[in-house]
Amino acid sequence: MGARKHNSAEARKEALKQMYFAKLRNVPTSPRKMRLVADMIRGMEVNRALGVLKFSNKEASARVEKLLRSAVANWEEKNERKAEEGELFVSRICVDGASTLKRLRPAPQGRGYRIRKRSNHVTIYVDTLNNDNN
């Protein structure tokens, strides 16, 4: 590996140590449906976001709620203390498309219609409201 590439990789590694995130991979829900849930909590304070997700009637909200709890636990693990009320917020949430399973549905006259069963990857980043202590 060249020196420039090595230095940029080290810088990325150091930047990741300052971020608090959780990833959920290969979720069997379409990215479009998952983005509806992600848009509900983007930029919200964590406790309020957990309340919104708990009472949402979307199927994807239970998965995002569990992922958000994991991101908060990751923050607590890195900082070696419990998160206080109103201290954390959802700084970023990304929903990216994952692999698609393709299936055939029988159609008239010997044809087959393609069914695309989509899946996605979700990444949640949490951060403190006041970044003075980091």
Swiss-Prot record:
A GO molecular function assigned to this protein is: structural constituent of ribosome
- Entry GO terms, CC: cytosolic large ribosomal subunit
Q: Which residues cross the membrane?
A: none
What span is annotated as the signal peptide, if there is one? none
Gene Ontology annotations of biological process type: translation
Q: Does the keyword Ribosomal protein apply?
A: yes
State whether it acts alone or in a complex, and with which partners, per the record. Part of the 50S ribosomal subunit.
Function in brief: This protein binds specifically to 23S rRNA; its binding is stimulated by other ribosomal proteins, e.g. L4, L17, and L20. It is important during the early stages of 50S assembly. It makes multiple contacts with different domains of the 23S rRNA in the assembled 50S subunit and ribosome. The globular domain of the protein is located near the polypeptide exit tunnel on the outside of the subunit, while an extended beta-hairpin is found that lines the wall of the exit tunnel in the center of the 70S ribosome.
Which PANTHER family does UniProt cross-reference here?
Answer: CHLOROPLAST 50S RIBOSOMAL PROTEIN L22-RELATED (PTHR13501), LARGE RIBOSOMAL SUBUNIT PROTEIN UL22M (PTHR13501:SF8)
Give the UniProt family note: Belongs to the universal ribosomal protein uL22 family.
Q: Write the protein's name.
A: Large ribosomal subunit protein uL22
Question: Which organism is this protein's natural source?
Answer: Porphyromonas gingivalis (strain ATCC BAA-308 / W83)
